């Protein structure tokens, strides 16, 4: 979905994203570190790598494919990916239309992503499609969503249900 409204939005903010989001990223770092510590030795997909700020939190020696809808965000992530002690392949891709074959990945990780996916159910179906049988989807979300089922899941989580 090259040229989509979502892609244009992230391209526009790529140059100042770190400045605008730094405090929040520091606040969420303990939870993200815990999430990323679950990265196994298999084939891993990281959805919405952005400018690559989270790469420094990844365990070493992993094989990761990291995608983002924004070419400008990916450009910013390149230097961090090069410095990673493992393998990171950066690709431009929309979560709603993944170009991977079915049952490709052992694990999929997302961090603060689905609040920005215009059709989150479609995106989740794509993640399910590309996960191997028994594969894991691990997510960190930071905000309320107006999309079903995230709205209900996040409400239940906040209220202990």
Model-derived regions: residue spans:
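Short glycine-centered segments of the SAM/dcSAM-binding site in methyltransferase folds
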Residues: 43, 63, 134-136
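A short acidic, Gly/Pro-enriched loop at the edge of an enzyme's catalytic core
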Residues: 96-108
């Amino acid at each position: 979905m090259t040229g989509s409204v979502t892609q244009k939005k992230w391209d526009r903010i790529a140059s100042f994203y770190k400045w605008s989001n730094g405090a929040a990223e520091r606040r969420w770092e303990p939870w993200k570190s815990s999430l990323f510590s679950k990265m196994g030795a298999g084939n891993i997909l990281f959805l919405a790598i952005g400018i690559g700020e989270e790469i420094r939190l990844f365990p070493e020696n992993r094989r990761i494919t990291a995608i983002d809808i924004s070419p400008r965000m990916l450009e910013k992530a390149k230097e961090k990916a090069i410095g990673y002690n493992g393998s990171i392949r950066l690709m431009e891709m929309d979560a709603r239309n993944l170009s991977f074959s079915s049952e490709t990945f052992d694990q999929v990780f997302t961090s603060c992503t689905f609040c920005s996916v215009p059709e989150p159910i479609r995106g989740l179906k794509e993640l399910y499609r590309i996960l191997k049988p028994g594969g894991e989807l691990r997510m960190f979300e930071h905000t309320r969503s107006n999309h079903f089922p995230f709205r209900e899941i996040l409400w239940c989580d906040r209220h202990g249900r």
